[in-house]
């Protein structure tokens, strides 16, 4: 009889990272009753603490909330990736202490009654904690919460810099088109991840990516049928440890049933596939000028809509968007009255439940990877409007590489002065809501493939089994 094993998961503090990490842990615990998992949770200074309310989580999964670390110039960090990496680094001593506290006595004795520490599973932004795993003489694995194409692009650029001596920032003029082996089509520099747009961020990002090679394997929240080209590229050489596509890892339950019920009742009254849903993630918000363009586009499109509209944090402050106290202060005069019979403007949105509702026919999205996987799972086509991080890359992949989305503005950056016109937004809404489009047909086919990937005999089911065998 094999001795039970314990894995320590360290997700980055963003809610999307934590949610997919929890789903990863649930999959592992469900597959092997000899696996025990401890999830170390870091709290962002401007966000609500994570609380586990999912009754379906195994008793073999334990959550430990780490003490808050002293912030280190967090408000002047240039992009979310750099912020997360610095934030995780500041928690290194707390991670070490937490692991010491959860180590079973059997690690100091020869008893086999308690789980042995088998390894760390680190978030894509937590690779600096490989040093801590080494102190405990256990291997590290990486959990890449984004897609295989982003992993491949980062790995490719890191190799160009470190092995070819190429200054990546010289390739990133806005008009350049790059040959990236993980993409079939030429890749426009205008849609590079935000962390590769200037010398300082690029250096920090690629230095971090180079640490991935020190892990024993990389779990990716994707599936073979969606990203076969990028996954085959990653498997084609020895530049990166073995990759295990284990997605889609999704939490399809609403976290606030009371708020969700009113929204879902409204959707119940709408015809099938008639509502376009606009939502831009936990960090997504727009200034007043852009909000008015969106409102104009919705009104002119004539489509029924459900719009999650969030207020931006104060200028220059790193904080989460919040709900408006009075929507009339930001929307065009009379908009709510004129659209009352066809639309609903909300704050927080139970996104998974909305995407799973039969009335939802299209999704105007920032193309965050969790949101993308939720939309594909439910067979809802996307109108791509990325905001930051690797979302521009995701949009390119969906629109150009895979034909699973239409474009609103693929090269949009939320920190730019660009205001997307109502005409461009309306055009995207009309296209994504076409009921007989090729995009909708492809999305429906991918929805079926995403569900098959997770069941016995599916590609991700088999890949997860190989990972369990390894640990």
Curated annotation (Swiss-Prot):
Residues binding UDP-alpha-D-glucose, per UniProt: 282, 348-349, 366-374, 388-391
Temperature dependence: Optimum temperature is 30 degrees Celsius.
The keyword Transferase is assigned to this record: yes
EC number in record: 2.4.1.-
Keyword annotations of the record: Glycosyltransferase, Transferase
SUPFAM superfamilies cross-referenced by the UniProt entry: UDP-Glycosyltransferase/glycogen phosphorylase
Function: Glycosyltransferase that possesses chalcone and flavonol 2'-O-glycosyltransferase activity. Converts phloretin to phlorizin (phloretin 2'-O-glucoside), a potent antioxidant. Possesses glycosyltransferase activity toward, naringenin, naringenin chalcone, eriodictyol, eriodictyol chalcone, apigenin, luteolin, kaempferol, quercetin, isoliquiritigenin, butein and caffeic acid. Can convert phloretin to phloretin 4'-O-glucoside and phloretin 4-O-glucoside.
Name of the protein in its database record: UDP-glycosyltransferase 71A15
Upper lineage: Eukaryota, Viridiplantae, Streptophyta, Embryophyta, Tracheophyta
């Amino acid at each position: 009889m094999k001795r039970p094993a314990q894995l320590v998961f360290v997700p980055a503090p963003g809610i999307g990272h934590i949610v997919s990490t929890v789903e990863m842990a649930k999959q592992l615990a469900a597959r092997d009753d000899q696996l025990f998992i401890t999830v170390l949770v870091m709290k962002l200074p401007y966000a609500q603490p994570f609380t586990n309310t999912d009754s379906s989580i195994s008793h073999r999964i334990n959550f430990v909330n780490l003490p808050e670390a002293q912030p280190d110039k967090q408000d002047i960090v240039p992009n979310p990736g750099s912020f997360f990496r610095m934030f995780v680094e500041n928690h290194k001593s707390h991670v070490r202490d937490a692991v010491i506290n959860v180590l079973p006595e059997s690690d100091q004795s020869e008893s086999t009654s308690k789980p042995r520490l088998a390894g760390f599973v680190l978030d894509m932004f937590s690779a600096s904690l490989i040093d801590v795993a080494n102190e405990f003489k256990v291997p590290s694995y990486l959990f890449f919460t984004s897609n295989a194409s982003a992993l491949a692009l980062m790995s490719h650029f890191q190799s160009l810099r470190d092995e070819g001596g190429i200054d990546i920032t010289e390739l990133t003029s806005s008009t350049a088109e790059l040959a990236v082996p993980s993409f079939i089509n030429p890749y426009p520099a205008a849609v590079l991840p935000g962390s590769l747009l200037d010398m300082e961020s690029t250096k920090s990002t690629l230095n971090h990516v180079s640490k991935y090679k020190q892990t024993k394997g990389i779990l990716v929240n994707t599936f073979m049928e969606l990203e076969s080209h990028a996954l085959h590229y990653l498997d084609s050489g020895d530049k990166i440890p073995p990759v295990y596509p284990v997605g889609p890892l999704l939490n399809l339950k609403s976290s606030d049933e009371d708020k969700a019920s009113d929204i879902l009742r409204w959707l119940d009254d709408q015809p099938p596939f008639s509502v376009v849903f606009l939502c831009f993630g936990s960090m997504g918000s727009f200034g007043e000028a852009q909000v008015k363009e969106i409102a104009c586009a919705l009104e002119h499109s004539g489509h029924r809509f459900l719009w999650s509209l969030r207020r931006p944090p104060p200028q220059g402050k790193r904080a989460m968007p919040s709900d408006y106290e009075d929507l009339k202060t930001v929307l065009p005069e009379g908009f709510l009255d004129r659209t009352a019979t066809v639309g609903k403007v909300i704050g927080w949105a139970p996104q998974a439940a909305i995407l799973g509702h039969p009335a939802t026919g299209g999704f105007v999205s920032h193309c965050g990877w969790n949101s993308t996987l939720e939309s594909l799972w439910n067979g809802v086509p996307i109108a791509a409007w990325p905001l930051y991080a690797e979302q521009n890359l995701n949009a390119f992949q969906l629109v150009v590489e895979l034909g699973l989305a239409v474009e609103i503005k693929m090269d949009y950056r939320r920190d730019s002065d660009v205001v997307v016109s109502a005409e461009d937004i309306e055009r995207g809404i009309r296209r994504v809501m076409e009921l007989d489009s090729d995009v909708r047909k492809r999305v429906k086919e991918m929805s079926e493939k995403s569900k098959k990937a997770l069941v016995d005999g599916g590609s991700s089911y088999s890949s997860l089994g190989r990972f369990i065998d390894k640990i």
